[in-house]
Amino acid sequence: MIAMNMDELGTQHEEIALIAAQLRQAIADPDQPQAVSALRWQLARKLMAHLALEDRILYPALQRQGDDRVRTTAARIQAEIGALAESFARYMAAWTDERITRDWRGFCADSGRILDALARRIDREERILYPLARSVDDGATGQIARAG
């Protein structure tokens, strides 16, 4: 068994939210194009690694728990907000630097939608999922066991 540190996932949420806020600030004026390439890729690196941990390890581990409430809550949240990795990958592929330059307003609108979805996911996980995961962990270390 390998352990997943819930505190580390929370720290990753903070880092992702900070980069997302910087990107949101950069797109705040749809009439004033900004250099956003570095921010987008920084967010992509952090977010995709984080989502892989959650989607491939945390959610399945919670869905294997003996407690029906834990299993159904994890499954419900994943069904409601679990498609973010695919949506974000499509967003990154669709918005090349050249296309961003040509269609800044469209990029701002699409970025706003993806950042809103990200904020909703982080909020749901921080309010519901992470406390649930901590309730089934070993209590002392903030870790949940996973097969590995």
Protein language model annotation of sequence segments:
Residues 1-148:
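Small-residue-biased structural context
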